[in-house]
């Protein structure tokens, strides 16, 4: 069950991100850690890669906004990062941005059995997801695809 403050935190982070030319990709509040941790994933609205300076600058601005809003009353750690290895791709933009990157695809086959494939992401359109597995193109019906996750080369 998501933390009750998560919607407010997401709204605040989305607003701060938009003001700085970023998009919010994800947010999590990890209350089981001491101190609790607010993880925020951002990317540039124009598609340019996010670097460490971007994350540091965004962290400062979001940190000030969080303090002003007084949403978190306990000690917390603020972690800012950009999507990378291990991230699940979901939006059309994700699939455009990470074309040619290694991915793990979890899908259901004709027998409704869950299968995992690894290859290079080629394309996702309205009907199919295409990956390159050792030089062969595999087309999967999009409605059979359960998840697509970035992996590291050769993993």
UniProtKB/Swiss-Prot annotation:
Say yes or no: keyword Cytoplasm present.
Answer: yes
| Lineage top rank: taxon | Bacteria
Q: Which GO terms describe its biological process?
A: ribosomal small subunit assembly; translation
User: Keyword annotations for this protein?
Assistant: Cytoplasm, Ribosome biogenesis
Give the chief site where it resides: cytoplasm
Compartments, record wording: Cytoplasm
Q: Which GO terms describe its cellular component?
A: cytosol
Concerning Gene3D superfamilies, the annotation shows: RimP-like superfamily, N-terminal
Which Pfam family, an example, fits this chain?
RimP_N
The task this protein performs is described as:
Required for maturation of 30S ribosomal subunits.
Please give the family membership noted in the entry: Belongs to the RimP family.
- Protein name from the UniProt record: Ribosome maturation factor RimP
Q: Which gene encodes it?
A: rimP
């Amino acid at each position: 069950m998501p933390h009750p403050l998560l919607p407010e935190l997401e709204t605040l982070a989305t607003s701060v991100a938009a003001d700085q030319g970023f998009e919010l990709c994800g947010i999590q509040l990890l209350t089981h850690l001491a101190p609790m941790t607010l993880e925020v994933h951002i990317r540039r609205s124009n598609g340019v890669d996010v670097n460490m300076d971007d994350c540091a600058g965004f962290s400062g601005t979001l940190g000030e906004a969080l303090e002003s809003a007084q949403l978190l009353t306990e000690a917390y750690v603020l972690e800012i990062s950009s999507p990378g290895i291990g991230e699940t791709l979901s939006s059309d933009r994700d699939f455009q941005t990470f074309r040619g990157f290694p991915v793990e695809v979890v899908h259901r086959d004709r027998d409704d059995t869950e299968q995992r494939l690894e290859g290079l992401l080629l394309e996702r359109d309205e009907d199919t997801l295409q990956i390159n597995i050792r030089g062969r193109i595999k087309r999967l019906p999009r409605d059979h695809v359960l998840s697509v996750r970035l992996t590291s080369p050769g993993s």
